[in-house]
């Protein structure tokens, strides 16, 4: 559903931020 899609996108964004901070 829509909620699941939003959760997936938030996970991707969060992962990108973590990667950016670490590097």
Curated annotation (Swiss-Prot):
Keywords assigned: Amphibian defense peptide, Secreted
User: Which GO BP terms apply?
Assistant: defense response
Please verify whether the record's keywords include Secreted.
Answer: yes
Secreted listed as a keyword: yes
GO cellular-component term (any): extracellular region
Q: What is its main location?
A: secreted
Q: Where does the record place it?
A: Secreted
Q: Where expressed (tissue)?
A: Expressed by the skin dorsal glands.
Q: What does this protein do?
A: Has no antimicrobial or anticancer activity.
Q: Which family does it belong to?
A: Belongs to the frog skin active peptide (FSAP) family. Aurein subfamily.
Its recorded name reads Aurein-4.1
């Amino acid at each position: 559903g829509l909620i699941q899609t939003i959760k997936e996108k938030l996970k991707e964004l969060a992962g990108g931020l973590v990667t950016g901070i670490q590097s």
